[in-house]
C-alpha cells in the first residue's frame, strides 16, 4: 500500500486498474480484522495473525475465488471449511472481505484528498459544519429562492457498480463488488443515516458511509458543467448602493466612451447568483431570479439524475422555498432573510435630505420549540417546558450533577451561539437550572430554596471559569444581544436538535 501511494503521485491510472490485486494482500485483512473487533492498538505481525485463533487467510482467498465462480444467487461463505473457523461464524469472513472492499477503494480517494489538502497541515476548521453559515450569511441575502434537495436513494446495486465503472477499470474488482452488493441486496437503502446504503449492520457502517459519500459525490459531479456556465458569478462583491437608479444612469452615460468595458461590467452585475451547500443527505441551492428560472432548475436536476442513474426522482425531494415568505430549517437553525430599513441622511452641496435604505439581512434563529421538545424527550422538562428533576442522577456526587447539567448547557450555547436572538437560549438555561436544583433537592431531601442558599452562585455556573468569558461574548453585557459568533470547532450537529 505504501508503494501504491508512492506510485499514485506519478500515475493515478494504475490505482484504477490493479485494485483487485490488493484484495490478496494480507495487510488489508489484518486491518479488516482489527476493525472488526474495534481495536485501536497497533496491528500485530502478520505471521502471528494467520494462525487459527485469528483467521485463515487461505480461506478468504478461496472465498473470493468461489464468489467469481458462483452463478445466480451468491452466498460465498457457505462452503467455508468449518474446521478452520474455530468458533467464528461465516459472517466473520464476510466481514473480512467487506473490509478489504472498503480499504481498497479508499486508497485512490485518500491519495487524491491528501494532494488536495497539501499546505493545510494543522488547519482543521474546514471540517466544521459551522463553516456553512458564514458563507450563507454573505451570499443568501442576495438570493430570493432556495432549492432544498434530498439526495435520491439508490434502489438497485447495479447502479452503484455503474458509477464505479467510470473511474475503476479493474473488471475483477467490479465483479467482486457486484457480487457482494447483490448478496446484501435484501438490506436496501434506508433514510436513516446509520443505514445509508445497502448494508445496514454496524460492522459494515464504514463501507456504507464510503458508498454513500461516493454516490453523493457522483450526484454533485452532475452540477459541475452547469456551475461552469455561471462561473462569472463566483466571488462577486455585493454592496448596498444608495440611490441605485441614478447609479445605473451614470453608468449608461459613460457607455459612449467605454462601450465594451461597461457592457461587460453590466453583465457582471446582472449575472445570476447561485450558491451550493451540502450536508449529509441534503443539498441546498440558493438562486437569485424569477420563479420560472427556479422551476427550470428543478426540472433539469430531476432529468439529470434520472438519466444518469436510471432511477425515478420524486418531485417532492426538490422543494422550492421563497425567502421573503418562509424560513427553512438547516443544521438545527431556522434560517430566513428579513428586510432591514435604515434611515440615511444624504448631504449635497446646497441641501441635505433623509432617505430610507432597505437591505436584506441573514437571520438565523435557534428553534426554541424543537429544543424544548428534545429536552422533554430526555426528561429534563415536560412538553410545555416545565422542569422535571432527574431522579436517576441522585446517586451521583454534587459536583457530577452540576457538571452534567453545565455540560448540556455549554453544548447548547456553543452550538447556537450564531443565533441572532438569544432569548430562546436564556430560556434553555432557565429550564436546565431548575431541574438541576430539583435533582440536588431530591438528593439531600430538602427544598429548592435550601439548595440555592447552600450553593449560591456555584449552582449551574461551576464549569464557567473566568477565562471563558472572552469566548462567551454574546452573553457579555457590553456586547450587542444580536451579535453572532460561528465557532469553527463544531464538526457534528447538536444531538438535542432533531431537525
Curated annotation (Swiss-Prot):
Keyword tags: Chloroplast, mRNA processing, Plastid, RNA-binding, tRNA processing
* Cystine pairs: none
- Mainly localized where? plastid
Where would you find this protein in the cell?
A: Plastid, Chloroplast
An example molecular function term from Gene Ontology annotations? RNA binding
GO CC, alphabetical: chloroplast
Enumerate the Gene Ontology biological process terms: mRNA processing; RNA splicing; tRNA processing
Q: Keyword Metal-binding: yes or no?
A: no
Keyword rRNA-binding included in the entry's annotation: no
Q: What does this protein do?
A: Usually encoded in the trnK tRNA gene intron. Probably assists in splicing its own and other chloroplast group II introns.
Report the sequence similarity comment from the record: Belongs to the intron maturase 2 family. MatK subfamily.
Q: Report what the protein is called.
A: Maturase K
Which species is listed as the source? Ceratozamia mexicana
Q: What is the lineage of its organism?
A: Eukaryota, Viridiplantae, Streptophyta, Embryophyta, Tracheophyta
Q: Which gene encodes it?
A: matK
